[in-house]
């Protein structure tokens, strides 16, 4: 027996030793790969290539294990870049003598989420316009452009259209799934309490169709956004007002021939012909059999090695990205966790080198408790240094709640904001339990609230009154926060609140925001208030991770390829996952939410 245990533990030790050696070797290989990766360079007469098939988020994207292994492949995949990355690359390329133009490629497929939003595309579009002012051309190659992609690409000097191209141009839409019938069929009870007649998040759980109030607000919202999109495209392509929408309505899908005849494109030409033409004009990259080029991510690597215009002072601006649903607790990389964000904002508030905070909001809201946590820290910071808000695709409900703690708010015309309203939602399984012979009984103190949140019992009228009172209290607090933050009378706020969403352009008109502008405008404004000059140092949260942090995440995460090409099955899967995530995010400890649904499709 002694011999057995000796052999057993000896073998076990050997296994652990081998695993340890393998792990050390693995980490060493990864580190060597990082060190030995080819240093990016820019050849003379190069074009900067912007691949819009890759999502462009506001915040640095969640780490993927594929990025760690990218260096093992001779042909590295392009890694996703952020909005600020793209803007920085375009702005530097305008004055870089080696960069002669920009080439836009890839099919931007509208999917659920927050990346590549219209406000982000608008800011990139404006940067491309300034790039053209340096007398450098912008080219675009179009295969199957959806409206957001074409909105961006229409700024190009030359739009090369593939002979097999189909332009899929449609306006924004919303087709929510309604679960009330299914929930009733399966015996699941839903009880709702809300403040704000336009507060539509709960509708799929209690209705079988869209309410008149929600239809009213969405029709107005979509009209504002669509008007901005069509007007911008018509001006860029030299088309008469109203002609773009007329073309779409009369033809549906627009093929390449019609696109060129209608001035949506410059000429029909295959990709190989475009490559040959650009090789002739700018020189050839023999290794890759294409024209001389540098991708945005590679160009950023060059810029990191050759920083320009960064002041020697340690003073800086903190850019905080509130991108995703606001949830209670720490949250994940895809969420805005109330505790985590409040803690980081507190650090920036207490850091004397941080002279201003820019909060980039791209969130539909969420937990009322978490929104208040973040609001308090922002308000405390605003007492000692400028806090400026830049609104992205969404800054609605809880996203707007945290915004009003700031000194100044920037939004884009196509930002979705407002939604000053609150709701609570309780699920009970009383009927399904009864149908299956499950009963419940209880012993409590004299406190009537002891069984308030029993999931087997339907809430009584008295219970509902208690919960409605809590929702009304938070709504009044929301209105008060807006009233004080925006210097509006409570009556004025109530008139434009009620859970109604507004476009950024309308929000500026009714004084929910101060100015029309993007992230760059907000940073410039904050820099001016903090006296940091034209090119302030920036620190970001969430920030980019170093190798040790990436290795930690590698052992916690499932590797997945970067999202570039999306097949129809994956697209449906993402839609279902998005619907489920909406429900899973309802984790407020008090069951009170300031949340706007994100079932809008940008087509």
Where are these regions (language model features)?
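Short acidic-hydrophobic, aromatic-tinged amphipathic segments that line or gate anion-handling sites
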Residues: 160-161, 265-271, 410-411, 513-518
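C-terminal structured domain segments across diverse proteins
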Residues: 326-327, 332-585, 596-602
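Sec-exported extracytoplasmic/periplasmic mature domains
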Residues: 91-98, 129-136, 155-158, 184-188, ...
